[in-house]
Curated annotation (Swiss-Prot):
The modification N6-succinyllysine is found at residues 30, 59. Its main location: cytoplasm. The gene is ALDH9A1. NAD(+) binds at residues 180, 232-236, 391. InterPro entries: Ald_DH/histidinol_DH, Ald_DH_C, Ald_DH_CS_CYS, Ald_DH_CS_GLU, Ald_DH_N, Aldehyde_DH_dom. This is 4-trimethylaminobutyraldehyde dehydrogenase. The keyword Protein transport does not apply. GO terms for cellular component: cytoplasm; cytosol. It catalyses: 4-(trimethylamino)butanal + NAD(+) + H2O = 4-(trimethylamino)butanoate + NADH + 2 H(+); an aldehyde + NAD(+) + H2O = a carboxylate + NADH + 2 H(+); 4-aminobutanal + NAD(+) + H2O = 4-aminobutanoate + NADH + 2 H(+); formaldehyde + NAD(+) + H2O = formate + NADH + 2 H(+). Belongs to the aldehyde dehydrogenase family. Homotetramer.
């Protein structure tokens, strides 16, 4: 398949083990191919009746799935992981067409997706409570039980991966899930739904509804939904939390960030430069945990900046389906204009553009309407600048200088966000001392933007709460029942 040829020809809702058209609507949306600007799908947003049918189907499937043993669920999840692994290139291609990231990166995403399913398949058979001995031979025990129908609401930067990150632990615990992808990227999650069905989950266990804010509201407020997990912006996350609170539903929120990356003068320069590029330019900079505030110790500021600019200018921009492309288009034109607007404001506030920050027009005529820009490196930045304070969500790196460890820690933590942070240094004592003080949920030492499924991922402060990945996520998709067993006579106060 090549850029500019794909068109969606099947329904984009999934319910009861099959693709379906929604029975009612809350509007229509268009999905684009960012590389070419073409419309690849016009689809109906699910209305309240469709959402209710999806939830009821999930509720029925939950009754079957929750009664299966952990090992039975394990085998089915492993089969789903195997299918994803076999269809890796197909799924990655679909992800690239609808999202715009390079096929090189998309394959990484699909690999972490099947690894996520394998990881939670391994945990499915090991979930257990504990036994507590009480006086007189009595005892108590706990049971870890599923919640019921969970809702996953995904973001457009990692459509397939996020669906796996949310559904794998949910299903491993015995839950069902209704998933709503971003209306910008509605396509690839349907492949996951079909794969789950092929692997053997009960029909209705993983359903997909399409739509925007109205559809999300129907899901969050549905009386039979037990939990909501959301990935996206802080303002939307706040609304999700408010709507869910009315039904006393637990939520997991993975929201935005403006993360610090601290480069000390004793760093390995080559690795620090590579880390800074990884922290800013993956998926065209459209990554919530990106380390976009790059603090560089003054002794190496000029050397570091020169090398970063040199490497940034070498990034191959263009058709994301070509093997040598390393940066594709941004998600859509409004977002491209928004990111370019941040660069304009940065210059007005005194920042200096060392490279990029402007529109890129590929030579291929079929890409002329795509949403491309050159990756941007800003210097002469101050902590009070808009480009340093607000999440840009594009390929824009802001470089700031610092003198001392104490100073940079205070500045790094001076943000309402707390998703991620990183430090590059050869001093292992300093590395651990610094990350202990950083107010962020995911910290990197001498690397950045790696997300092994074994490690919990989530934020502090306004970047959200709850965790995805790692063993601890089981606690966010299950509930604990305590059973007290009396082996003697009842001691009554009456």
């Amino acid at each position: 398949m090549s850029t500019g040829t794909f068109v969606v020809s099947q329904p984009l809702n999934y319910r009861g083990g099959a693709r379906v058209e929604p029975v009612d609507a809350s509007g229509t949306e268009k999905a684009f191919e960012p590389a070419s600007g073409r419309v690849i799908a016009t689809f109906t947003c699910s209305g309240e009746k469709e959402v209710n049918l999806a939830v009821q189907d999930a509720k029925a499937a939950f009754k079957i799935w929750s009664q299966k043993s952990g090992m039975e669920r394990c085998r089915i999840l492993l089969e789903a992981a195997r299918i994803i692994r076999e269809r890796r290139d197909e799924i990655a291609t679909m992800e690239t067409i609808n999202n715009g990231k390079s096929i090189f990166e998309a394959r990484w995403d699909i690999d972490t997706s099947w690894q996520c399913l394998e990881y939670y398949a391994g945990l499915a058979g090991s979930m257990a409570g504990e036994h507590i001995q009480l006086p007189g031979g009595s005892f108590g025990y706990t049971r870890r039980e599923p919640l019921g129908v969970c809702v996953g609401i995904g973001a457009w930067n990692y459509p397939f991966q996020i669906a796996c990150w949310k559904s794998a632990p949910a299903l491993a615990c015995g839950n069902a899930m209704v998933f709503k992808p971003s209306p910008f990227t509605p396509v690839s999650v349907l492949l996951l739904a079909e794969i789950y069905t092929e692997a053997g989950v009960p029909p209705g266990l993983f359903n997909v509804v399409q739509g925007g804010a109205a559809t999300g509201q129907f899901l969050c407020q549905h009386r039979d939904v037990a939990k909501v997990s959301f990935t996206g912006s802080v303002p939307t996350g706040s609304k999700i939390m408010e709507m869910s609170a009315k039904g006393i539903k637990p939520v997991t929120l993975e929201l935005g960030g403006k993360s610090p990356l601290i480069i000390f003068s004793d760093c390995d320069m080559k690795n620090a430069v590579k880390g800074a590029l990884m922290a800013n330019f993956l998926t065209q900079g459209e990554v919530c945990c990106n380390g976009t505030r790059v603090f560089v110790q003054k002794e190496i500021l000029d050397q570091f900046t020169e090398e970063v600019v040199k490497q940034t200018q070498r990034i191959k921009i263009g058709d994301p389906l070509l093997e040598d492309t390393r940066m594709g288009p941004l998600i859509n034109r409004p977002h491209l204009e928004r990111v370019l607007g941040f660069v304009k404001v940065a210059k007005e506030q005194g920042a200096k553009v060392l490279c990029g920050g402007d529109v890129f027009v590929p030579e291929d005529p079929k890409l002329k309407d795509g949403y491309y820009m050159r990756p941007c490196v800003l210097t002469n930045c101050r902590d009070d600048m808009t480009c340093v304070k607000e999440e840009i969500f594009g390929p824009v790196m802001s470089i700031l200088s610092f003198d001392t460890e104490a100073e940079v820690l205070e500045r790094a933590n001076d943000t309402t966000f707390g998703l991620a942070a990183g430090v590059f240094t050869r001093d292992i004592q300093r590395a651990h001392r610094v990350v202990a003080e950083l107010q962020a949920g995911m910290c990197f030492i001498n690397n950045y933007n790696v997300s092994p499924v074994e490690l919990p991922f989530g934020g502090y402060k306004k970047s959200g709460f709850g965790r995805e990945n790692g063993r601890v996520t089981i606690e966010y998709y299950s509930q604990l029942k305590t059973v007290c067993v009396e082996m003697g006579d009842v001691e009554s106060a009456f």
